[in-house]
Amino acid sequence: MTKLTARQQQVFDLIRRAIERTGFPPTRAEIAAELGFSSANSAEEHLRALARKGVIELAAGASRGIRLLAGPEDSPHQFTLPHASIMQLSLPLIGRVAAGSPILAQEHISQHYACDPALFSSKPDYLLKVRGLSMRDAGIFDGDLLAVQKKSEAKDGQIVIARLGDDVTVKRLKRRPNGLELIAENPDYENIFVETGSAEFALEGIAVGLIRPGEF
């Protein structure tokens, strides 16, 4: 069993609750504000201590790049699925999406996963396999399984799944006076501006959770 200090346990529990509630880990600034640290640097020190103890993994340069590994009590609350007897959702896993066809077309479904609904902030309709690192700083990495709820509308600031012509992308939505912007959470990627009424744009859904691969 990994031994944590009281403060480290608070940080670990905060990360766990944030992921359970929103599907994503908190930023250093959010940890500092929640726990009353003087600065985000203080949160960073505790995160590094947790990483040294092997209970989390940090992604360099990513504000939300925190992955929970084994907890101090080997807690199964993050990224691991509960025993089959309490699994309630059967979610299709979507791999690559062919140009011009619906996301949930049968040919896109590679398999189904049984998942505990408590893993998600709202009930998802499917899992989408993430390609690339454009959302790295939101804690979304290549190969992750993004839980998606089908929606044709989204709130400002939500992480959305959008269709742009023949492509499907995951970005953070930001409304602008004459359209909207799809924001990448990685400075190596460009944001995408979409004019109001663009026929090339369609909102497919919103992100309601995240599962790491290999944890089923």
Curated annotation (Swiss-Prot):
EC number of the protein: 3.4.21.88
Catalysed reaction equations from the record: Hydrolysis of Ala-|-Gly bond in repressor LexA
Enzyme class label: hydrolase
Molecular function (Gene Ontology), one example: DNA binding
GO biological process: one example: DNA replication
Keyword terms: Autocatalytic cleavage, DNA damage, DNA repair, DNA replication, DNA-binding, Hydrolase, Repressor, SOS response, Transcription, Transcription regulation
InterPro entries linked to this entry: LexA (IPR006200), LexA-like (IPR039418), LexA/Signal_pep-like_sf (IPR036286), LexA_DNA-bd_dom (IPR006199), LexA_repressor (IPR050077), Peptidase_S24_LexA (IPR006197), Peptidase_S24_S26A/B/C (IPR015927), WH-like_DNA-bd_sf (IPR036388)
DNA-binding region location: 28-48
Superkingdom of this protein's organism: Bacteria
One Pfam family this sequence matches: Peptidase_S24
Description of how the protein assembles with itself and partners: Homodimer.
Stated role: Represses a number of genes involved in the response to DNA damage (SOS response), including recA and lexA. In the presence of single-stranded DNA, RecA interacts with LexA causing an autocatalytic cleavage which disrupts the DNA-binding part of LexA, leading to derepression of the SOS regulon and eventually DNA repair.
Annotated family: Belongs to the peptidase S24 family.
Full protein name: LexA repressor
Species, as recorded: Paraburkholderia xenovorans (strain LB400)
Gene that this sequence comes from: lexA
